């Protein structure tokens, strides 16, 4: 019995504890990201932001959660009720399981698999299904149009995201996310410089992937009322809301891993090694999240034709050219990694 426990049950308990240790702080981070967004945008617009519930408004996310929890869930009469309820759950769950392969510090990762990049790409591709199901099951033309927009937008920018990731794989030689970070420790400065434009393209692409300004066309209030979640209330709306912000944190962590060295000190400065890698990871993710909020506060929304033109006529040719350029330079300098 003891042997059975240590061989089968104990590893499952450890995995469950790791999942809880990642999920609960992440949900808290999502809740307080909404608070940070309102405060940052308030300061940029010369107003206070939330400041009533608790000291400095710090309990506002909890008040919002309690309000949504006790609201009545309203299901439209002619909707597909099972899919209508299932859609926000799919979106929220997919936004959490992507974290399984993200390394928070050296050796601190839930599943250190050799195909972590493929796993992340698969999860990001699946996330559109929750939105499409929500738009179709709501039996509303506004929700359906928002879902169609979202699917077209995400497919368009996933192409350029994939090509950008290929340039990273060419320079690092591994699909393991921890391996990508460690490869950046010894990467020549000129390769970092060559990847910089792709880092900018990747960040703009994930803005579109997460439906954030200036690419929030699926939720355009002036055109589609509220987009694919227009018929949702109570916890259904809350799960979509949590999923969107959890995806923001996830894509910031991906950008940090691919282009900013993950848990490594900035510019690989050796005398900063005494600071834990987890601190640097959180600092870099926090900086990128601030960029998300800054962009929302300052940029107007693109028209839909401008959004598509940027994805297919600018980013796709640029990333294709850059893959060829990086490959040629690496072959010429004998730095091509064997993926």
From Swiss-Prot:
It is an enzyme of class 7 (translocase). One of its GO terms (biological process) is aerobic respiration. It is found in: Cell inner membrane. One of its GO terms (cellular component) is plasma membrane. InterPro entries: NADH_UbQ_OxRdtase_su1/FPO, NADH_UbQ_OxRdtase_su1_CS. Its EC number is 7.1.1.-. The chain crosses the membrane at residues 9-29, 50-70, 82-102, 115-135, 161-181, 187-207, 235-255, 275-295, 311-331. Its main location: membrane. It is a multi-pass membrane protein. It catalyses: a quinone + NADH + 5 H(+)(in) = a quinol + NAD(+) + 4 H(+)(out). It comes from the Bacteria. Keywords: Cell inner membrane, Cell membrane, Membrane, NAD, Quinone, Translocase, Transmembrane, Transmembrane helix, Ubiquinone. One of its GO terms (molecular function) is NADH dehydrogenase activity. Belongs to the complex I subunit 1 family. NDH-1 shuttles electrons from NADH, via FMN and iron-sulfur (Fe-S) centers, to quinones in the respiratory chain. The immediate electron acceptor for the enzyme in this species is believed to be ubiquinone. Couples the redox reaction to proton translocation (for every two electrons transferred, four hydrogen ions are translocated across the cytoplasmic membrane), and thus conserves the redox energy in a proton gradient. This subunit may bind ubiquinone. NDH-1 is composed of 14 different subunits. Subunits NuoA, H, J, K, L, M, N constitute the membrane sector of the complex. NCBIfam families: PRK06076.1-2, PRK06076.1-6. This is NADH-quinone oxidoreductase subunit H. It comes from Rickettsia felis (strain ATCC VR-1525 / URRWXCal2). The gene is nuoH.
């Amino acid at each position: 019995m003891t042997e059975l426990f240590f061989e089968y049950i104990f590893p499952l308990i450890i995995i469950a504890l790791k999942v809880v240790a990642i999920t609960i702080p992440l949900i808290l981070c999502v809740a307080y990201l909404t608070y940070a967004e309102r405060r940052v945008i308030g300061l940029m617009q010369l107003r206070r932001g939330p400041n009533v519930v608790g000291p400095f408004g710090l309990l506002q996310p909890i008040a919002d959660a309690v309000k949504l929890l006790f609201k009545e869930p309203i299901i439209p009469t002619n909707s597909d009720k099972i899919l209508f309820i299932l859609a926000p759950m799919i979106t929220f769950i997919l936004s959490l399981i992507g974290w399984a392969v993200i390394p928070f510090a050296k050796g601190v990762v839930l599943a250190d698999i050799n195909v972590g990049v493929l796993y992340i790409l698969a999860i990001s591709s699946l996330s559109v299904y929750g939105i499409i199901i929500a738009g179709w099951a709501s039996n509303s033309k506004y929700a359906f149009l928002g879902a169609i927009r979202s699917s077209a937008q995400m497919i368009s920018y996933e192409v350029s995201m994939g090509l950008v990731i290929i340039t990273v794989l060419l320079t690092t030689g591994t699909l393991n996310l921890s391996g990508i970070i460690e490869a950046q420790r010894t990467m020549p400065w000129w390769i970092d410089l060559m990847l910089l434009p792709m880092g900018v393209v990747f960040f703009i692409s994930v803005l579109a992937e997460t439906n954030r300004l200036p690419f929030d066309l699926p939720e355009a209030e002036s055109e589609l009322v509220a987009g694919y979640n227009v018929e949702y209330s109570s916890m259904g709306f809350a799960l979509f809301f949590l999923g969107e912000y959890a995806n923001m944190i996830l894509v910031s962590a991906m950008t940090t891993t691919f282009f900013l060295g993950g848990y490594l000190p900035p510019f690989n400065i050796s005398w900063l090694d005494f600071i834990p890698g987890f601190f640097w990871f959180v600092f870099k993710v926090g900086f990128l999240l601030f960029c998300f909020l800054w962009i929302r506060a300052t940029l107007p929304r693109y028209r839909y034709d401008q959004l598509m033109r940027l994805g297919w006529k600018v980013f796709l040719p640029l990333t294709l050219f850059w893959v060829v350029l990086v490959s040629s330079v690496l072959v010429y300098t004998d730095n091509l990694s064997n993926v």
